[in-house]
Each structure stands twice: as C-alpha cells, then as structure tokens.
C-alpha cells in the first residue's frame, strides 16, 4: 500500500560518516525583516540537540537595506549560546531574491540534513529540530513533513496538519498528496530533508514562487516521505510581503510554477491530473470577480490550454480566449 497510517519502531542509521555526529543545517534568509527576525532566530537558538547530532544555523543577509543585520548581530553578541548552535552569518555579493538567497544558504550549509525557516516565522517548540531529526533517521526517510499554525492578519489562527501519521513510499501518491490533497505542502519550511536528496536538484533561483518550482521535484526524488500530525511552525501572514500583497499575482505565480513542472511529470497522467486540479483551484478563484479585460485573464487561459495539452496530448484541440463585445458569447473557440 502506498500510504500507511502506522508507526514503525525500527531504528536505522543515518547517512553520516562513521565516527562523526550528524549535523542539521537550519537556513534563514532575511531582507527587510527587522520587525520579526529576532523571533525566528531566537526560536532556532533555543533548539536543543543530543549526542547524536549538532545544529548549524546558516543565516543569509540578502543585502537587506534596513536594520535587520545590526539587530541580529547585537542579539548574537549579547545572548548566551547555551545550546552551542554553530551560527554562520553569510552574505552574497548582490541581492538574490528569495530563491537565490535560499540556494546560497544551501551552498553554505555543511549539514547532512536541511531545514528552513523564514525570517518572519518561528519554531513553536524547543525540541522541534530534535524530533524532526529523530523522525527522519528512525524512519530512514528522505523528507519528513510537519504541520503549521497559520496566523492571519485579522488575528485568527488556522492549524494545518494531518490527523494521523502517514508514511508514503510511492512517488505518484506523494505527488497527488502534494497537488491534490495538500497533505504535503508546497512550502519549504515545514520539512526536514536529507541533504543528498536536495543536491540532486538545485533550489530554484526565482524571486517568488521558487518553492512551487522546487518542492514537487524534491518530492518526486524521495523514496520515502513521512507526514507527521503535529503543528511545529508558526507562519505569520505579515502585511508588506511581496507575495501576500497581490492575490492576482500570487495565484498566477502558483499556476505558472505548476505549469513549469509539466514537462518533468509528463509520463505520469495521474500526477498531471492532480497538478491540473490544483491549478484549476487557483484559476477558478482568479476568474471569480475579475473581468475578461483583466491583464492576467489571457495569461490564465493560455496556462490552462498549455496544461490540458499535456494531459490529453492526442485528443485535445487548441483553445484560445475569444470574448468580443457580446457578453453572452462563449469565451472559447476551437482552432
């Protein structure tokens, strides 16, 4: 069976060099994050570890123009590092954007496991990294997924996690859980990864929606994924984010990111259909309340056509958007 809802008690060895402790690298990138960055950094610096592994904290200053770095350096200088976290503050030669900065962080990480945390989010519990490490080692998994608490701007909180532990050892099922059921999230920061898995496909350097172009590929490369029924990351929907300010651009970016993966998964029709279903959720939401004169409307239809061609390559006819002055006319025509 592809997905199992039971625990396995088998203990296994991790992919470390004989005689050496494992190292978990946590990566945070920041840009104009002076308001929240200490919450994120402190939540990592408070993480406990064991004799089996150490924690390396790679913090990437993506040429932030505000006081984030000064605030961070003052905190690191005055705060006792009681847990002996190995802090590495690095800076690229130029601003790279979200995707490029994360890739830069990965390149500077020396751990054999990777975790990520955005500068405006934080880990809820002090033993999260420890439990994530133990889970990925004991299950001999490539990826372990955890849930999150989504803090909305209006103060409401939404918990997002599965009800019971799931073990997925089938690539197609994993992709369906990602695109259709949302049990596996597109975001990069609710997971722990084996570094050697991530090395097989470079993190996207896109400035936004880079995770949509990366996570599905990492999921497809994983032989075993574990999904845990616990919320471990506090996700803050903060105003001013380059992603959250424009819903239209956000959904278009998600759809475009999904479409960019169709070539990779073109030989698995079930995965393609799951991907298309996920994209259609965003398409439907975009169409609702937007007129056909919206600049993004034609782009949406072109993406829809592009995806359908992959799913039904032998039978699908080219469709283009065609609304004229008659509002009752069909918006589509066959060519």
Where are these regions (language model features)?
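Membrane-interface aromatic/basic loop that binds lipid-linked glycans or pyrophosphate carriers
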Residues: 1-4, 8-18, 290-335
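Nucleotide-sugar donor-binding/catalytic module of glycosyltransferases
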Residues: 2, 9-255, 334
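Active-site activation/catalytic loop segments of kinase-like enzymes and analogous catalytic loops
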Residues: 60, 283-292
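Generic secondary-structure transition motif, activating predominantly at the C-termini of alpha-helices
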Residues: 76, 80, 137, 181-182, ...
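Short glycine/serine- and small hydrophobic-enriched flexible loop segments
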Residues: 220, 260-263, 285-288
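Catalytic core of nucleotide-sugar-dependent glycosyltransferases
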Residues: 232-238, 244-273, 293-313
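Long, charge-rich low-complexity segments
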Residues: 261-277, 323-335
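Amphipathic alpha-helical repeat scaffolds of TPR domains
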Residues: 274-286
């Amino acid at each position: 069976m592809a997905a199992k809802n039971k625990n396995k008690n088998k203990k296994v060895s991790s992919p470390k060099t004989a005689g050496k402790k494992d190292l978990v690298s946590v990566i945070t990138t920041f840009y104009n994050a002076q308001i929240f960055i200490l919450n994120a950094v402190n939540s990592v610096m408070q993480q406990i570890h064991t004799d089996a592994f150490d924690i390396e904290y790679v913090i990437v200053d993506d040429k932030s123009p505000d006081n984030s770095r000064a605030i961070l350096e003052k905190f690191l200088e005055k705060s006792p590092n009681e847990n002996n976290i190995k802090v590495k503050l690095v800076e690229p030669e130029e601003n790279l954007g979200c995707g490029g900065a994360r890739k830069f962080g990965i390149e500077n990480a020396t751990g054999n496991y990777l975790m990520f945390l955005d500068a405006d989010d934080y880990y809820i519990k002090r033993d999260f990294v420890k439990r994530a490490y133990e889970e990925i080692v004991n299950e001999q998994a490539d990826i372990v997924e955890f849930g999150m608490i989504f803090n909305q701007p209006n103060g409401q909180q939404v918990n997002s996690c599965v009800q019971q532990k799931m073990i997925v050892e089938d690539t197609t099922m994993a992709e369906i859980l990602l695109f259709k059921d949302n049990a596996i999230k597109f975001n990069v920061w609710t997971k722990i990864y084996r570094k050697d898995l991530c090395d097989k496909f470079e993190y996207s350097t896109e400035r936004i929606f880079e995770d949509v172009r990366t996570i599905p590929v990492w999921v497809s490369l994983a032989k075993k994924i574990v999904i845990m029924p616990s919320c471990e990351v506090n996700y803050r929907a903060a105003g001013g984010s380059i992603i959250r300010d424009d819903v239209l651009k956000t959904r278009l970016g998600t759809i475009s990111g999904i479409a960019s993966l169709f070539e990779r998964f073109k030989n698995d029709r079930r995965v393609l259909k799951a991907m298309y279903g996920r994209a259609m959720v965003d398409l439907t939401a975009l169409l609702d309340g937007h007129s056909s004169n919206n600049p993004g409307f034609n782009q949406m239809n072109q993406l829809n056509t592009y995806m359908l061609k992959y799913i039904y390559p032998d039978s699908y006819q080219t469709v283009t958007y065609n609304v004229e002055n008659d509002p009752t006319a069909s918006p589509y025509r066959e060519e």
